[in-house]
From Swiss-Prot:
This is Putative Rieske 2Fe-2S iron-sulfur protein YhfW. Binds 1 [2Fe-2S] cluster per subunit. SUPFAM superfamilies: ISP domain (SSF50022), Nucleotide-binding domain (SSF51971). Belongs to the Rieske iron-sulfur protein family. [2Fe-2S] cluster binds at C463, H465, C481, H484. GO terms for cellular component: cytoplasm; membrane. The keyword Cytoplasm does not apply. Disulfide bonds join C468-C483. Its EC number is 1.-.-.-. Keywords: 2Fe-2S, Disulfide bond, Iron, Iron-sulfur, Metal-binding, Oxidoreductase. The keyword Disulfide bond applies.
């Protein structure tokens, strides 16, 4: 990164560098269990923890290494303050629905805190108040309206004008008794508990397909199979759709994080702006000093301007508010957003109650993962759960769901058609080492990346998920799909799903 504030040339997440995670073998044989969990992030691990605690035989598989995806790149705010949602939820779904959503996520905070206390986990758990604020006089009424929603729902709250930190706030809404923590230190302890209780974990084990039945079967890339009573898909975007039409009901949204040594003295609290571009702040302590995690500048994955410019935009916003001494770490992440902003947690489809899913957390995965773990475990045990109807993937709300489905899929179609018609006028000699660009080969769009040795890597830019054309991400050095968020290495290997197969390599010889 060119700016003098950035201490590192490439993105790196603090959570990973500060945690020595265990490693696990790949699956080498067919096996059976009670529950197969696909996905080694916070949702899969927490669900495996809960199920092994309840006495179930669990196998968890991860395509890469555990805690290497979205969870490792979070800002780890443990809160039920999920942006400006409660007035919207009351208007669209009713007071009871909105109250249950809040209760589910507030209970999730207590659930996580209970695990931290039970196992004495050293994960920097600190209770914090969460602040929604605006620096725009024209948006003050929005804060008042959300405050009214908090009042209707009985949320412990406060309305203040001046924040403890100089962000130019005109008005702020406080949600009391939320929290922050170090997510990987917490989840490392859960991994240990899973293994102690007999759970089995396999890394580098890619799920390719699911065979339905009374005892459904996960088929892996190595052709080994896992039979179980239940399968739970926690793989971010579900690799298996099961007739649930998830590609038509979610989109992938990307955002950026700077870990900043600030010029100001940072107080307590977690802060989220409702203005555009929206930014969020919390702190973590590194080597005895507070670093501010300054995040935001979101956009749909694979869409918009050069990805590296988003870091610079975020840096400028931070410089103008908190001041910057240095930026020891920076990274980016993406998450899935459902059309109605409520996660999908429950049966993959109405006809398959033994294949379950958890996805679409809208970047609020710390509490959503705990909601999912308890709800999915109750479904496995055939126990009633008061939040089942809120999160069920088979729900359908006419307003605003239908309009957003139409709008979102029109956007997908636009990018699909645009990519197919595009014929980039870029020559191979125009691509410098470390650069990737779309090119035209034999009349067809392709992707070219030149590595530091000067070698050119060519791939077909057609995403192997549903056929959209991927775009180059100059910050992460990946090919990103603007339709459903799949990401690929310069040489075509899958970095992040829903795609399972790599981009096709092109050989000019």
């Amino acid at each position: 990164m060119a700016n003098q504030h950035f201490a590192k040339e490439a993105p790196e997440t603090y959570w990973k560098t500060s945690t020595d995670l265990p490693s696990f073998p790949a699956l080498q044989e067919d096996t059976e269990c009670d529950v197969t969990i696909i996905g080694g992030g916070i949702t899969g691990i927490t669900t495996a923890y809960e199920l092994t605690k309840r006495g179930f035989r669990v196998v968890l598989i991860e395509a890469n290494q555990v805690l290497n995806g979205t969870t490792a790149h979070t800002t780890a705010k443990v809160t039920a303050q999920h942006d400006m949602i409660y007035d919207e939820f009351i208007r669209h779904f009713g007071l009871n629905h909105a109250r249950l959503y809040y209760e589910a996520n507030q209970n999730a905070i207590d659930y996580i805190k209970g695990i931290v206390d039970e196992h004495q986990i050293d994960c920097e758990w600190i209770e914090q108040d969460a602040y929604l604020y605006t620096a725009n006089e024209n948006a003050v009424q929005k804060i008042h309206t959300e405050h009214e929603a908090y009042t209707k729902l009985g949320i412990e709250r406060d309305l203040i004008k001046d924040l403890p930190i100089p962000l130019g706030s005109k008005l702020a809404l406080v949600m009391k008794n939320q929290a922050q923590f170090h997510p990987l230190q917490y989840l490392k302890a859960l991994l240990e508990q899973i293994v102690q209780k007999g759970g089995r974990i396999y890394e580098e084990t890619v799920a390719l397909d699911i065979k339905k039945g009374e005892r459904p079967e996960v088929v892996t890339k190595s052709r080994h199979a896992i039979k179980s009573r239940f399968i739970i898909c926690c793989s971010h975007f579900p690799f298996y759709d099961g007739g649930g039409l998830y590609a038509a009901r979610m989109y992938s949204d990307r955002s950026y994080v700077l870990a900043i040594k600030p010029k100001i003295e940072y107080p307590e609290g977690m802060y989220l702006s409702i203005d555009q571009p929206s930014v969020a702040l919390r702190y973590t302590v590194v080597n005895g000093e507070k670093l501010i995690l300054f995040s935001g500048v979101s956009h749909k994955t694979g869409q918009g301007k050069a990805m590296s410019t988003h870091y610079e935009t975020l840096r400028q916003l931070a410089e103008s508010t908190i001041g910057i001494e240095s930026i020891p770490y920076y990274w980016s992440t993406q998450d899935l957003v459902t059309i109605d902003k409520i996660p999908f947690i429950g049966p993959m489809s109405e006809n398959e109650d033994n294949i379950l899913v958890a996805t679409g957390f809208k970047k609020w995965g710390m509490t959503s993962s705990a909601v999912a773990a308890t709800l999915l475990s109750d479904l496995v045990e055939k126990k009633e759960n008061p939040y089942e109807s809120i999160f069920t993937p088979s729900r359908f709300h006419l307003n605003p769901g239908l309009q957003k489905v139409i709008s979102y899929n029109a956007d997908v179609a636009k990018h699909l058609i645009k990519g197919k018609l595009e014929k980039p006028d870029v020559q191979f000699e125009d691509i410098s080492p470390g650069e990737g660009k779309a090119v035209t080969i034999n009349g067809r769009r392709a992707g070219a990346f030149r590595d530091e040795t000067g070698c050119l890597h060519l791939v077909d830019t057609t995403c192997t998920h549903l056929g959209c054309e991927v775009e180059w991400n100059d910050s992460e050095h990946t090919w990103d799909c603007p339709c459903h968020g799949s990401r690929f290495k310069p040489s075509g290997e899958v970095v992040e799903g829903p795609a399972i197969k790599p981009l096709k390599q092109i050989d000019l010889d």
